[in-house]
Structure formats: structure tokens, C-alpha cells
Amino acid sequence: MEEMILEKDLLSITRKNVDAFLETHDVKYVAEDAVYKHLGTGDEYNGREAIGAMLNYMYHVAFDAHAEVTNKIITENKAMFEGKFIGRHIGEFAGIPPTNKEINVPICVCYDLEDGLIKKGRIYFLGDVLMKQLAQ
């Protein structure tokens, strides 16, 4: 019985942490040795600091953007969200100077979790959709 209660407590903490991360992108919810991989480009970000820098660049430097979550699943050791990366292109991205164009790009991220923190992230981002929107 005690083990079941502890599992429920960990799941509750994990859900709160993942929900908070999806809302804020605060890397305190990311393990120090976490790894993110962008499956479309092969780019890999190793460690909390590198992941934080990538998130800051995407959400605040290249774009003024946010993630709009349309679906999510959170378990004790896995999480997934599907949604849209929505915002405005305000800084250099992939050699393209700021266009000030609105963007709305489908995104899905799958996470491996450990002790309530994100340990691995696999990013599925439709870069071709983004590039079309920046070119229009």
C-alpha cells in the first residue's frame, strides 16, 4: 500500500513539473545531464545549460513565441505534447534576418522523465512549414 502511495506522489509531482515546464520552459524542470535532439535536423543539445540556451533562442531571440499545447500525455517516466509553435519572427534564424512575420508551426515533443525531471527530449518540428511561412 505504501509503495502505491509513493508512486501516486511521484506521478503527481511529475505531472506538476511537466505542466510547469510546458508553460514556462524553465530549465529547473530539466535534469542537469539531459539531452534534447531535434529529429528533423539532427541537432543535439547536451545538458541543462545548452537546452536552456536553445529554448531561449527559439522563444525569445529568433522568435517572440510560445507553445500552444493541444494534446499531452504524462506518465511517471514519459511525457508527450502536441501543439503549435506560435509567434513572430524577430531575430536572425537559419540565415534569415528578422521578417516580423507571424508563424504557426506544428510541433510534437516526446520526453523521457527521471525523478520528476526531463531527462531526454525528442523534438519533431515541421521546419519546412516554418520556412514557407518566413518566405511568404
Identify the role of each PLM range:
Residues 1-136:
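C-terminal and inter-domain tail/linker signature
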